[in-house]
Design a protein with these regions (language model features):
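Conserved, structured core segments of small domains
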Residues: 1-91
Length: 91
């Protein structure tokens, strides 16, 4: 399994209406251990989340099912593989 840092930029006209469904989706990912942390940036221009997947293809499947992606609420997003090294939850 690999960790990925996903950063998003919101479509300002669409994201607020979709946010409840997006958060429900992320809550399910958190409950099954796939999602470590997520949240919006302080300026509400986008957000970031740290997510675990088998590989980039598996991550893409997860992202493709996110209501923000399905409903066009993102202008863009970037993905970088991330190697957690230190922190309270890193073992």
């Amino acid at each position: 399994m690999a960790w990925f840092l996903v950063q998003t930029v919101y479509n300002q006209e669409k994201y607020a209406a979709v946010r409840p469904r997006h958060r429900e989706y992320l809550a399910k990912l958190a409950a099954d251990g796939t999602l470590a942390v997520a949240g919006p940036f302080a300026d509400d221009s986008g957000g970031a989340f740290l997510i675990q997947a088998a590989d980039a293809d598996a991550l893409q499947e997860i992202l493709d099912a996110d209501p923000y992606v399905v409903e066009g609420a993102l202008e863009s997003f970037t993905v970088r593989e991330f190697n957690p090294t230190l922190g309270a939850w890193v073992q």
